[in-house]
Amino acid sequence: MRKKTVQIMISHSLMIGLWASAFPGIRAGLEGYTPEHLALFRLLIGSMALLLFAVLTQMRLPDLKDIPAIFLLGFLGFAFYHILLNIGEKTVSAGVASLLVTTAPIFSAMLSRLFYKEHFGFTKWLGSMISLLGVLLIAFGAGDFTYSMSGILVILLAAFSESIYFVFQARYIKKYGFIPFVTFTIWGGTIPMLVFLPGLGEEMMNASISATLSIVYLGLLPTVIPYFALAYVTSFVGASEATLSLYVTPALALIISWLWIGEIPTLLSLLGGVVTVGGVCFTYLKVNKMNKIFITHFSAKRVKKL
C-alpha cells in the first residue's frame, strides 16, 4: 500500500513538473522556430516515441469506424491546441499562458452542459465570471493591451479547443483505454500538421542548439509522459482527483519560467492569474450537504428570534 502511495505521488509530481515546464519550453523553442514548425516538430518526436511504444506493447489499432472521430479529436486536442498556444506565447509570457490554459475545465463544463445536459449551476456561472475578470486583469497587466489581448484570446481559444478534446474523449477511452487513446489522437494530430513540413529542415539548420533541444525535450517528455502518469493515477483514484493537482501547474510554471528564461510577470498579471485560477476552482466547488443543513437551520433560528 505504501509503495502504491509513493508511486501515485511520483506520478503527480511528473504531471505537474513536466506540464509546467512545457510553457517556458515553448518560449525557448520560439526563439528559433515558427509556431507551426515548433508544433509539428514536437508532435513528430512524440509520435515516433509512441510508435515505438505501440510496437513493443503490440497495441491494438482502433476500429475503422472510430478513426474519423479520433483524428478530429487529435486535431483539436493536439494540432490546433499546440499551434494556437505557440502563437499566443509569441506575445504572452509562459507563466501567464499557463494560467490562461487553466480555463479549459470551465469550457469543458459548459460543453458538458450543452451536449450532455450536465448540471451547470450558479457556482459554475459565478466562477466563470470570476475567471473572466482574472483574464482582463492579466491583459491589463501585460503592458500593451491590444498587443497582449490578441495573444490572450488565441490562448483562450486553444483552451477551448482542448476542452472539446476532454469532453468527447470518454467513450473512446472506455473502449480502447487511456494510453492507446492518447497515442491514437497524438498520431491523428500529427498527420494534418505535415502540411507545415516544408521549411522545417531549413529552420533546424538555422536554429540555435538550445531552441532545438527545447523542442526535443517538449516532444519526448511533456507531450507523452504526463499523459501516461495521468492514466496511472486515474486508474487508482479516478479522473477528478487525478486532475485536481494540475491546478498547481501555473504556480510551478511561473517559477520554472523565471529560472529557465528569466521571465518575471507583472504584479497585476500575477493577481489576474490568481483570480483566474480561483474562478476555476470556485466553478468546481461542491457545497457539503451538512453545511447546507447548518446554514438553513441557523437562518431559521435567526428568523424565529426576530
Swiss-Prot record:
<keyword id="KW-0677">Repeat</keyword>
<feature type="transmembrane region" description="Helical">
    <location>
        <begin position="91"/>
        <end position="111"/>
    </location>
</feature>
<keyword id="KW-1003">Cell membrane</keyword>
<feature type="transmembrane region" description="Helical">
    <location>
        <begin position="177"/>
        <end position="197"/>
    </location>
</feature>
<feature type="transmembrane region" description="Helical">
    <location>
        <begin position="67"/>
        <end position="87"/>
    </location>
</feature>
<dbReference type="Pfam" id="PF00892">
    <property type="entry name" value="EamA"/>
</dbReference>
<feature type="transmembrane region" description="Helical">
    <location>
        <begin position="125"/>
        <end position="145"/>
    </location>
</feature>
<comment type="similarity">
    <text>Belongs to the EamA transporter family.</text>
</comment>
<keyword id="KW-0812">Transmembrane</keyword>
<dbReference type="InterPro" id="IPR000620">
    <property type="entry name" value="EamA_dom"/>
</dbReference>
<feature type="transmembrane region" description="Helical">
    <location>
        <begin position="6"/>
        <end position="26"/>
    </location>
</feature>
<feature type="domain" description="EamA 1">
    <location>
        <begin position="17"/>
        <end position="140"/>
    </location>
</feature>
<feature type="transmembrane region" description="Helical">
    <location>
        <begin position="251"/>
        <end position="271"/>
    </location>
</feature>
<feature type="transmembrane region" description="Helical">
    <location>
        <begin position="213"/>
        <end position="233"/>
    </location>
</feature>
<keyword id="KW-1133">Transmembrane helix</keyword>
<feature type="transmembrane region" description="Helical">
    <location>
        <begin position="148"/>
        <end position="168"/>
    </location>
</feature>
<keyword id="KW-0472">Membrane</keyword>
<feature type="domain" description="EamA 2">
    <location>
        <begin position="160"/>
        <end position="285"/>
    </location>
</feature>
<dbReference type="GO" id="GO:0005886">
    <property type="term" value="C:plasma membrane"/>
</dbReference>
<keyword id="KW-0813">Transport</keyword>
<dbReference type="InterPro" id="IPR052756">
    <property type="entry name" value="Alkyne_AA_exporter"/>
</dbReference>
<protein>
    <recommendedName>
        <fullName>Uncharacterized transporter YdfC</fullName>
    </recommendedName>
</protein>
<feature type="transmembrane region" description="Helical">
    <location>
        <begin position="37"/>
        <end position="57"/>
    </location>
</feature>
